[in-house]
């Protein structure tokens, strides 16, 4: 999150808000609720969604964005190099049965028209591309 804020700031853009939804077991809102908030916020022109392997929240948020959001959106999914079936990270995210993989999440995001950064270092560039694609 701090990396995304730093990159956006270095692009000369500000932030209306930064939301950390927390780990898998306990969090204050879903990815979909967060993107809905930013979509409806008049002080937000574009946003970056950061997710991780495990679960299906990013795919659900991507579907919501596809059907409801006209703002530029970029995304990054952490955990692309995580071994299948192994718990990873602070939330103990696990990829099992083909669900929750970084590749599946990235594909769902791309299908929703979201520009996906391959690495954390590319989040700002992905947002710039998303904004350019929307004529900003």
List PLM regions with ranges:
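Catalytic-core regions of core metabolic enzymes
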Residues: 1-136
């Amino acid at each position: 999150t701090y990396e995304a804020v730093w990159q956006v700031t270095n692009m000369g853009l500000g932030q209306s808000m930064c939301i950390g939804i927390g780990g898998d077991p306990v969090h204050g809102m879903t990815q979909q609720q967060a993107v809905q908030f930013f979509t409806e916020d008049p002080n937000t022109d574009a946003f970056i969604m950061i997710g991780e392997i495990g679960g299906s929240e990013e795919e659900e948020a991507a579907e919501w964005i596809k059907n409801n959001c006209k703002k530029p959106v970029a995304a990054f999914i952490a955990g692309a190099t995580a071994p299948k079936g192994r718990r990873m990270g602070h939330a103990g995210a696990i990829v099992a049965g083909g669900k929750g993989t970084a590749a599946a999440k990235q594909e769902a995001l791309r299908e929703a028209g979201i520009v996906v950064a391959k690495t954390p270092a590319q989040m700002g560039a992905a947002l710039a591309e998303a904004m350019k694609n929307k004529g900003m």
